[in-house]
């Protein structure tokens, strides 16, 4: 049941993004200061700032979009997508970042495009609401 702090799908997107960026902060700290002794921390920080932070934000947006669909459309399958899609994107990022620059760039571009698509879908549904109190997606 929706609460006053979570009464529309965009709330799920905002909360998902904030949570994912909090996780990214912790993960980036670990990578920069703990894991790599042989690479200068500034190099790791720059690469992670340009790739990992947008990836985590994208995963949070994807998770939030599907969570919003689950809550406000009563879509049972969306809750699984809210978990599986970010897991897939993060796992693919982890694998491709060290495997192939070309494949990584294609994957990274696809991730960003897919994120913009989902975000736009939620924004359009928000704009199509008849009144502010309406909670369901159209």
Mark where each language-model region is.
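Hydrophobic alpha-helical segments at protein termini of multi-pass membrane proteins
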Residues: 1-138
């Amino acid at each position: 049941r929706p609460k006053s702090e979570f009464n529309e799908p965009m709330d799920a997107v905002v909360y998902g993004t904030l949570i994912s960026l909090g996780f990214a902060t912790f993960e980036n700290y670990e990578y920069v200061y703990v894991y790599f002794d042989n690479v200068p921390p500034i190099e790791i920080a720059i690469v992670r700032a340009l790739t990992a932070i947008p990836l985590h934000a994208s995963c949070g947006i994807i998770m939030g979009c599907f969570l919003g669909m689950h809550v406000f459309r009563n879509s049972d399958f969306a809750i699984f997508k809210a978990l599986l899609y970010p897991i897939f994107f993060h796992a693919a990022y982890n694998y491709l970042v060290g495997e192939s620059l070309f494949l990584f760039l294609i994957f990274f571009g696809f991730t960003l495009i897919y994120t913009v698509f989902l975000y736009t879908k939620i924004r359009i549904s928000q704009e199509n609401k008849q009144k502010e109190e309406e909670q369901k997606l159209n």
